[in-house]
Amino acid sequence: MSVIKMTDLDLAGKRVLIRADLNVPVKEGKVTSDARIRASLPTIELALKQGAKVMVTSHLGRPTEGEYNEEFSLLPVVNYLKDKLNSPVRLAKDYLDGVEVAEGELVVLENVRFNKGEKKDDETLAKKYASLCDVFVMDAFGTAHRAQASTHGVAKFADVACAGPLLAEELDALGKALKEPARPMVAIVGGSKVSTKLTVLDSLSKIADQLIVGGGIANTFVAAQGHNVGKSLYEADLVDEAKRLLGTCDIPVPTDVRVATEFSETAPATLKSVTEIKDEEQILDMGDVSAEKLAEILKNAKTILWNGPVGVFEFPNFRKGTEIVARAIAESDAFSIAGGGDTLAAIDMFGIADKISYISTGGGAFLEFVEGKVLPAVAMLEERAKK
């Protein structure tokens, strides 16, 4: 990967705009999982230490584009950064026509999705971002698969566009896992976004020795085996695709599950066989027998790619499957890479961050990289490095 790296530049006195991935869960004005901010801190601190005029920005959540909405403000992130850096951090709301930043100061530019044209990679907006800085640092691997104004367009127009340390590290770690993985390689794909991940399963089936499915994806495979899945989250129109995958590769489908009659934190869990699911029930976790079977597979792996929990781990009664799988990954000797927002939250919950070889901040980008797709923001950095 031939890109300019931030670590090769002298940033002293320069206006530096860092596009980080600070899209973290927030509850009642407080950050509830700080993994992505923690991952971005070294980049921010490096720029501050060099005496740069540092601006950092990100998206957070899915606000209506072009409209300010306090619920999606980066203020909780600013408060977190003040605390962690033990220094003042300003939040700039109106910054597109310029913002004053002192050397060694950090200013957070409000949620990029409050700007009209962000998602469409609007050229006028991209040029405004570019005019704010002397050096643009793309450090948000999690959004590198999206060609948007703050990830792709700005890199096209900034005087200098480079990769931040986190982005460079992510690409190196994923490259290592995918180009020459130690075998056997096990890939776990879980979570609730089913359709976006079934295509990934196809790509992974060609490089992984063993595929594991969980969450909403597993429900589609349970349905593909002819079982009733009741009110479970699954994709009826992808059942044939799941059948095809079952025919071409070895995918262990859950044989026992935890179900409930409502999707709620307090719903009692019933453990049962996949052959006994009633119309009014929904699968919210895999059962112990299924989870332990996966743990056994993970024990013998040499490379593990993990994207997505295997159940609704946010609900205490439906946490056990994900916990069994997470602890098996933590205890494995394999080179393990975990990616995706829900996966990071699960890692935090079970306190196993130090037992995972590499934690990727990307969700969709992680999966697209795994699929071998070109990430637009990275492609733009490569193009700029040639000039």
From Swiss-Prot:
InterPro entries: Phosphoglycerate_kinase, Phosphoglycerate_kinase_CS, Phosphoglycerate_kinase_N, Phosphoglycerate_kinase_sf. ATP binds at K197, E314, G340, G341, D342, T343. GO terms for cellular component: cytosol. Keywords: ATP-binding, Cytoplasm, Glycolysis, Kinase, Nucleotide-binding, Transferase. One of its GO terms (biological process) is glycolytic process. Substrate binds at D21, L22, N23, R36, H59, L60, G61, R62, R113, R146. Its EC number is 2.7.2.3. Coiled coil: none annotated. Gene3D superfamilies: Phosphoglycerate kinase, N-terminal domain (3.40.50.1260). It is found in: Cytoplasm. Belongs to the phosphoglycerate kinase family. PANTHER family: PHOSPHOGLYCERATE KINASE, PHOSPHOGLYCERATE KINASE 1, CHLOROPLASTIC-RELATED. Monomer. HAMAP family: Phosphoglyc_kinase (MF_00145). This is Phosphoglycerate kinase. It comes from Cronobacter sakazakii (strain ATCC BAA-894) (Enterobacter sakazakii). The lineage of its organism: Bacteria, Pseudomonadati, Pseudomonadota, Gammaproteobacteria, Enterobacterales.
